[in-house]
Curated annotation (Swiss-Prot):
PANTHER family according to UniProt: SKICH DOMAIN-CONTAINING PROTEIN (PTHR31915), TAX1-BINDING PROTEIN 1 HOMOLOG A (PTHR31915:SF7)
Acidic residues compositional bias, start-end: 496-510
Residue stretches in coiled coil: 148-453, 488-581
Molecular function (Gene Ontology), one example: zinc ion binding
ZnF bounds (UBZ1-type): 716-742, 743-769
Source species taxonomy: Eukaryota, Metazoa, Chordata, Craniata, Vertebrata
Disordered: region residues: 441-510, 630-691
Protein name as catalogued: Tax1-binding protein 1 homolog A
Compositional bias (Pro residues): 646-656
Length: 781
């Protein structure tokens, strides 16, 4: 039913009014008479029905019958705002028009109209006139004129007025009949539509109540699941905190191990330098001992020929004292060497223990990540179920809103960024695999982490809006019963008018009861919708909060994963560096030091006498007594000067297990039954020591080039590659480091590569030493 109102009036024929069905019944004017006194105070009584909401700017005006808009008022008064007004209630109000505002007696018809602040006319009264009171018989005057004729005053005026009123009455009666017929038809249609709307609303309310009950039950179940997930999340957070604490402890231990490694490196460097120096001293002392022994033998042979026996005895005693001191120094050097080997073994044991603790930490982190992934999967399943159930409860919900589209776009962007991060992680992971193939367990855990990184932890939220049906409350217009103007017509139509009024009152009461019931149902529906909206908001807030917590947890786990990767890489680098240094130290320690003989030297019985010269050549004239001990066990043999300059072995022996254990120094002397090919040693003149040999095995020549360095302190050292000359007293270790800097050395087999060698070839060679097992060096080149 339309809520607009139109009032039309025809100016001709005494101002007859044609009114259509409108909203004029929203304000009902009461006790409106047929006429009022002009220039006198006028009371206006009206009732505000529940279909109108009063406003302080509403007003009541006096309009001439035939007005066309709200601006055609004669005068008006503001409608007072009722006190303690309740929406939907009926209010009775009264206003008084002062006498100087009331129109004069002009024979026109007027009516009250209620105008809202928006300019809509929501109520109109029956027409009335402003005229003086009807004169009685006593008020009639008889006037005698010159023709002695009596003239009745006001008779003609009254007769004319009576004719106009009768004509207006006929028009109003016809209009009333038409309006009554039209009203009956509209009432029937309205009643039918109200019944249909009521039944539809009731069925809709029942359906919504059932849906609300189902949603409430499901919300309780989801709340229970959320509580379980919160408990699991709390456990994961506690485990994460413990892992963080453990990681912090590991970092502290790593720093401590770093400091220990640095101190051990410094100590090893110092011990290596001392060992080289002691080896050089020992070699010099060995040569000196041989010289003294030869001199002693010569002196014994000349003792019979020289009378100065006392001087010879003194020289012999001094030589024996020097020999004893040399033996003591050799014993001290052996003790220091054993201490250095024990320190190396302790350092390797600590490094292995650090590796085991790192593996345990990685296992704990993998378990925590698996629990996080399981909790995230449960949360995703719960969100999908909630979105599907909310979609079914929403009924005919339209397409997703713009907010959904924006959220979907953000989710796609997050997925793209996650994929890019996963690709970057894959590259880093492949690089780590190339550098460390021997750690199988760590590889499997990293592959599991790679699979977890591709998982999408972003879910799409669906916003459902329940649209409440707009129950269009129909409005009714009940035109007031037109009363008769003349007393004679009023008496004849009195009974019919009373019956019509009773019928109108009954219909109005029925309509009001139906409207009140509909209003009550509408109010209940609004309350239910409010409750549903509140439940949806609570559920959405809870899901958002849980999502935020899960995202924070994921970020923290990612940070822990990144820090663990950094720690792992740092530890691998330290392990490789320490392994290279340990391998280098082990190769240096494998060169056995000369052993002092326990038994006297087997001198020849009849050597030719030789004169004593001030500077005896370094080479023994009777041969090296140690070369005759080749048939002895390799453990008791000593190194010849040729053997001392041999390069270290290409690779350490294979280890039986991953445990770093202390290995005894290996003897480089040949086994029993084999002959060690000797090479001629050129002798130098004028007291020069024999030149250093350049022994290289055939295998060494095929694989790489090794250098033998002259350790004599009185010879200028020259780099064989860059031809840089160093002073005689330049440190031997610094000179060796300078020569080795021209090459890239394999950290496992010490094979040398030129600096311009391709990186891929160098890495391929290094990788060939590993087969994926920890500390397995069986596949050395």
């Amino acid at each position: 039913m339309s809520s607009s109102c139109n009032v039309g009036a025809s100016a001709g024929g005494g101002g007859s009014v044609v009114m259509e069905t409108s909203n004029f019944a929203h304000v009902i004017f009461q006790n409106v008479g047929k006429s009022f006194l002009p220039q006198a105070a006028l009371e206006c009584h009206y009732t505000l029905t529940p279909f109108i909401t009063p406003h302080p700017k509403d007003w009541v005006g006096i309009f001439k019958v035939g007005w066309s808009s709200a601006r055609d008022y004669y005068t008006f008064l503001w409608s007072p705002m009722p006190e303690n007004y309740t929406e939907g209630s009926t209010v009775h109000r009264t206003i008084i028009f002062q006498g100087y505002y009331v129109p004069r007696s002009d024979g026109e018809f007027y009516q009250f109209c209620y105008v809202t602040h928006t300019g809509e006319i929501r109520g109109a009264s029956t027409p009335f006139q402003f005229r003086p009171a009807t004169p009685t018989g006593e008020e009639l005057l008889t006037v005698e004129d010159d023709g002695n004729s009596d003239i009745l005053v006001r008779v003609e005026e009254v007769q004319q007025e009576c004719k106009e009123l009768q004509k207006a009455l006929r028009l109003l009666t016809q209009e009333r009949d038409q309006l009554q017929e039209k009203q009956r038809q509209q009432n029937q249609e309205l009643q039918k539509s109200l019944i249909e709307e009521k039944e539809e609303a009731q069925s809709r309310v029942r359906q919504l109540e059932q849906d609300l009950l189902k949603i409430t039950q499901k919300a309780v179940l989801k709340e229970t699941e959320l509580d379980c997930l919160r408990d699991k999340l709390q456990k994961v957070i506690s485990e994460r905190d413990s892992l963080q604490t453990q990681l912090k402890n590991e970092r502290d231990e790593r720093e401590l191990y770093k400091s220990h490694v640095r101190s051990a490196e410094l100590e090893n460097t110092k011990l290596s330098a001392e060992l080289q120096m002691l080896k050089a001293v020992e070699l010099n002392r060995e040569v000196t001992i041989a010289q003294y022994q030869e001199e002693l033998h010569r002196l014994r042979t000349e003792r019979d020929t020289h009378p100065a026996e006392t001087g010879l005895k003194e020289q012999l005693r001094q030589a024996e004292e020097q020999l004893q001191a040399t033996r003591q120094q050799a014993a001290m050097l052996g003790s220091e060497l054993r201490d250095a080997s024990g320190g190396r073994d302790r350092t390797m044991t600590e490094l292995y223990r650090v590796r085991q603790e790192a593996e345990e930490l990685r296992a704990h982190l993998a378990e925590a990540q698996e629990e996080c992934r399981h909790a995230q999967d449960q949360l995703d399943r719960m969100k999908n179920q909630t979105s599907q159930e909310m979609g079914r409860a929403g009924g005919g919900v339209g397409v997703a809103s713009e907010l959904e589209a924006e959220l979907q776009k953000e989710v796609e962007e997050l997925k793209l960024r996650l994929n890019m991060a996963a690709e970057h992680y894959k590259e880093k992971y492949r690089e780590c695999q190339r550098l460390r193939r021997q750690v199988t367990k760590l590889t499997q855990q990293q592959e599991t982490q790679q699979g977890d990184a591709n998982r999408n932890d972003a879910s799409t939220e669906t916003t459902l809006e329940l649209h409440t049906p707009d129950a269009e409350t129909p409005s009714e217009s009940y035109p007031a019963e037109i009363k008769t103007v003349a007393r004679d017509v009023e008496k004849s139509r009195d009974e019919e008018g009373n019956e019509q009024e009773e019928e109108d009152e009954e219909e109005e009461e029925c309509s009001l009861s139906v409207e009140a019931e509909l209003a009550c149902m509408e109010e209940k529906w609004r309350e239910q919708c409010t409750i549903n909206e509140n439940l949806k908001l609570l559920l959405a807030n809870e899901e958002k909060r849980f999502k935020t917590q899960v995202a924070e947890k994921d970020r923290e786990v990612s940070a822990l994963r990144e820090s663990l990767v950094v720690v792992t890489k740092e530890k691998e680098r330290l392990e490789k560096q320490y392994m290279r240094e340990g391998t280098t130290r082990s190769r240096r320690l494998e060169v056995r030091e000369p052993v002092v003989l326990r038994y006297p030297l087997p001198y020849p019985q009849d050597p030719p006498p030789l004169p004593l010269v001030p500077q005896q050549p370094a080479e023994l004239q009777f041969g090296n007594p140690y070369l005759e001990q080749e048939t002895r066990d390799g453990a008791d043999g000593a190194l010849s000067p040729e053997q001392t300059c041999r390069p270290p072995p290409l690779a350490p022996p294979p280890w039986g297990g991953p445990v770093v254990c202390s290995q005894p120094s290996r003897s480089l002397s040949p086994p029993d039954g084999l002959e060690n090919p000797t090479e001629e040693r050129p002798t130098g003149g004028d007291g020069e020591a024999p030149a250093v040999c350049e022994h290289q095995s055939l295998e060494s020549n095929e694989s790489h080039t090794s250098f033998c360095f002259d350790t004599r302190p009185d010879v200028h050292k020259q780099c064989p590659l860059c031809e840089v000359i160093f002073p005689p007293h330049f440190e031997q270790s610094s000179f060796e480091r300078h020569v080795e800097s021209h090459w890239r050395v394999c950290p496992v087999c010490s094979e040398q590569f030129p600096l311009d060698c391709q990186q891929q070839l160098y890495e391929k060679h290094v990788h060939t030493h590993f087969d994926g097992n920890v500390l397995n060096f069986d596949n050395f080149d």
